[in-house]
Amino acid sequence: MVNVLINGYGSIGKRVADAVAKQDDMKVIGVTKTKPDFEARMAVEKGYKLFAAIPERKHLFEEAGIPVEGTLDDIIEDADIVVDGAPKKIGKANLENVYKKHGVKAILQGGEKAGDAQDSFNSLWSYDRCYGKDYIRLVSCNTTGLCRSMYAINSVADILKARIVLIRRAADPNDIKTGPVNAIVPNPVTVPSHHGPDVVSVIPQLDGKIMTSAVIVPTTLMHMHSIMVETSGTNRDEIIDALAKTPRILTLKASEGFDSTAKIIEYSRDLGRSRYDLNEIAVWEESVNVVDNEVYMMQAIHQESDVIPENVDCIRAMLEMESDNLKSIEKTNKAMGLIK
């Protein structure tokens, strides 16, 4: 049983905490918050030991009537690994100023740059490379989703060139500061977007073969990808079969009512998923087509949750708890109640 500390109990951190708590080979020894908000109070109510991420703010929790066990410095030495859930760019600062100082292994999230850590993690592609490493970046929700679909395609044919258009949600449901509300925004307006190079940080053999562009649209539910991949040779049946065999990919049919991201989220609600999380990515089966060995398909990504099981697998890899990535994936999925 390994000790996991969650530094930053926010959108990602609280989900990772719940996922880790469901595993039988790891436990959450504490979570941190920078301010005494409702998430901090709920963390305590759920039984997590709460620590102030910033020592100077400990008194704010006490004044708000939220019990804290101490500060980050009081618990970090007990951790075998820290999962950093801090906002973008803060993770790198935490790595340099906290984790390396205390000699504790750490997982950064996708908001940090590839060069900030020793490697970039995806359960299917880079588990072996990250095995036993000290500081790893777990790639973003979009990159995680693309890595899964590229894995499926690569299992039946060589990828010669990949072109992906990402239609990104404007904000998470709880975000009142981000937009747009009434616009479609190229993000970035230049091509390629950062997503292609990010995929390459996980899958080096796609260097020079992947091109991505991205726009932001006024929705909060999910991202969507329109994928076009030139291959050495395949057919639709092979791709459908590969998607079905690849972990954490669901193939859903518009003919059965899955005709929008809203319906996919409704499905997740009906599954009884906490926070309506869909840790699996969803590929529309009708969108899968192969013309002259070029694969076309569309997939949806729940931006708040597809990286969560990857964090659990990354813990096992870095702490050398399981050498077989597929066994770790299976163990994580079973504990979290994933479909596949």
Swiss-Prot record:
Keywords noted in UniProt:
Cytoplasm, Glycolysis, NAD, NADP, Oxidoreductase
Q: Name one GO biological process term.
A: glycolytic process
Residue positions binding D-glyceraldehyde 3-phosphate: 140-142, 195-196
What does the record give under GO molecular function? 4-hydroxy-tetrahydrodipicolinate reductase; glyceraldehyde-3-phosphate dehydrogenase (NAD+) (phosphorylating) activity; glyceraldehyde-3-phosphate dehydrogenase (NADP+) (phosphorylating) activity; NAD binding; NADP binding
Disulfide-bonded cysteine pairs: these are none
Do you know which InterPro entries this protein is assigned to?
DapB_N (IPR000846), GlycerAld/Erythrose_P_DH (IPR020831), GlycerAld_3-P_DH_AS (IPR020830), GlycerAld_3-P_DH_cat (IPR020829), GlycerAld_3-P_DH_NAD(P)-bd (IPR020828), Glyceraldehyde-3-P_DH_2_arc (IPR006436), NAD(P)-bd_dom_sf (IPR036291)
**Residue positions binding NAD(+):** 11-12, 111, 169, 303
Alphabetical list of SUPFAM superfamilies matching this protein = Glyceraldehyde-3-phosphate dehydrogenase-like, C-terminal domain (SSF55347), NAD(P)-binding Rossmann-fold domains (SSF51735)
Which reaction is catalysed here? D-glyceraldehyde 3-phosphate + phosphate + NADP(+) = (2R)-3-phospho-glyceroyl phosphate + NADPH + H(+); D-glyceraldehyde 3-phosphate + phosphate + NAD(+) = (2R)-3-phospho-glyceroyl phosphate + NADH + H(+)
Q: Does the keyword NADP apply?
A: yes
> One Pfam family name from the record?
DapB_N
**Compartmental location:** Cytoplasm
Q: Which GO cellular component terms, listed alphabetically, does the Swiss-Prot or TrEMBL entry include?
A: cytoplasm
Question: Which residues are the active-site ones?
Answer: 141 (nucleophile)
Hey, which pathway is this one from? Carbohydrate degradation; glycolysis; pyruvate from D-glyceraldehyde 3-phosphate: step 1/5
HAMAP family given for it? G3P_dehdrog_arch
Family affiliation? Belongs to the glyceraldehyde-3-phosphate dehydrogenase family.
Q: How is the quaternary structure described?
A: Homotetramer.
Name the UniProt record assigns to this protein: Glyceraldehyde-3-phosphate dehydrogenase
Q: Which organism is it from?
A: Methanococcus maripaludis (strain C5 / ATCC BAA-1333)
